């Protein structure tokens, strides 16, 4: 957790387009170590696609029977439990309980908004999720400016990012 101390947040200090250089590296962003508690905390904030309890869970499974996958008690449960239930994650071929892809996408944007500051505007972002980040993993996000250009009156930069575990 000590790696979070070094996180650079530009905030209200403007980053001027004229000062940006092609090839410039952004500060490395650290995320982790991955924990099941962290996976659940993300699901609490996001809401999850299928995470419901009690009567709401019954309504979902009753309306969409294929959503429910029997747990160890034979009760239909959500597929998202691969994120907090180690045995189920292993059963489906994952290396263990693992993080959420949308959260990982948000980390990439977090790095860019920290770098650009409050006055910047994130115009476009896309990413590819290629592997799981199981509990215990630590993630390091590296990025660099690949292009600096103008489109009409817009002053833009393109940034390439890669995230790797320990």
Q: What positions do the PLM features span?
A:
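Short structured motifs
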Residues: 13, 124-130
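Hot-dog-fold acyl-thioester-processing enzymes
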Residues: 1-119
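Short, hydrophobic/aromatic alpha-helical segments in well-folded domains
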Residues: 111-112, 128, 144
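HotDog/MaoC-like acyl-thioester-processing domains
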Residues: 1-8, 12-22, 28, 41, ...
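Phosphate-handling active-site elements
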Residues: 116-122, 150-151
């Amino acid at each position: 957790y000590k790696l979070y101390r070094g996180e650079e947040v530009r905030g209200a200090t403007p980053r001027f387009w004229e000062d940006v250089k092609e090839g410039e590296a952004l500060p490395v962003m650290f995320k982790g170590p991955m924990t099941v508690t962290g996976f659940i905390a993300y699901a609490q904030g996001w809401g999850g696609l299928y995470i419901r309890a009690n009567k709401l869970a019954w309504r979902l499974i009753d309306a969409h029977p294929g959503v429910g996958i029997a747990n160890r008690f034979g009760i239909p449960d959500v597929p998202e439990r691969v994120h907090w239930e180690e045995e189920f994650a292993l059963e489906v071929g994952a290396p263990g309980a693992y993080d959420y892809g949308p959260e990982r996408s948000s980390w990439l944007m977090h790095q860019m908004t920290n770098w650009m500051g409050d006055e910047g505007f994130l115009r476009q972002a896309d990413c590819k999720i290629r592997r799981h980040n199981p509990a215990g993993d630590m993630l390091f996000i590296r990025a660099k400016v690949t292009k600096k250009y103008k489109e009409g009156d817009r002053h833009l930069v393109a940034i390439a990012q890669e995230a790797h575990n320990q």
